[in-house]
From Swiss-Prot:
Function: This protein binds specifically to 23S rRNA. It makes multiple contacts with different domains of the 23S rRNA in the assembled 50S subunit and ribosome. The globular domain of the protein is located near the polypeptide exit tunnel on the outside of the subunit, while an extended beta-hairpin is found that lines the wall of the exit tunnel in the center of the 70S ribosome.
Family: Belongs to the universal ribosomal protein uL22 family.
Species the sequence originates in: Staphylothermus marinus (strain ATCC 43588 / DSM 3639 / JCM 9404 / F1)
GO MF entries: rRNA binding; structural constituent of ribosome
GO cellular component, one term: cytosolic large ribosomal subunit
Keyword annotations: Ribonucleoprotein, Ribosomal protein, RNA-binding, rRNA-binding
UniProt name for this protein: Large ribosomal subunit protein uL22
Membrane-traversing stretches: none
SUBUNIT field: Part of the 50S ribosomal subunit.
InterPro entries for this protein: Ribosomal_uL22 (IPR001063), Ribosomal_uL22_CS (IPR018260), Ribosomal_uL22_euk/arc (IPR005721), Ribosomal_uL22_sf (IPR036394)
GO biological process, one term: cytoplasmic translation
Domain of life: Archaea
Amino acid sequence: MPTWHYSYKLRDESRIAKAVQFDIPVSIKDMREAVAAIRGKKVSEAKKLLENVIALREPIPFKRYKGKLSHKRGLPAKWKWPIGRYPVKAAKYLLRLLEHVEANADNKGLDKDKLVIVHIAAHKGMTLKRWMPRAFGRATPKFRRTSHVEIVVKEVD
């Protein structure tokens, strides 16, 4: 079994809560952009943003994986970037992960209203290789990509 550790160096464990989720069935490209949008925000603000993404009210800017994507209304005013999407599936899993880290912080006795995301990262997970039969005895690959996400929140004054 391979070993795993957080890519964030923990300093003061008493004021920090962390959570991780493995093998999320979301493309790493979508997950990376959603993670970048909530990095550095308060947990309550991040949850509100993700709920708006799920309801298709607010898009997330796509800065790296932006090929052939359209401009979305309201993005330049808030993010100074016109290109974006609504990664609903990634937002659902991130919202669940935020609830987990909030519960971990509550178990440590931290105040849920003062939590700030100090570290969040998405890593490439396992790729499930499947094949779809085609005509004349051929087959087409269908790859299911997964992601791993880790999050660390800190209580600020």
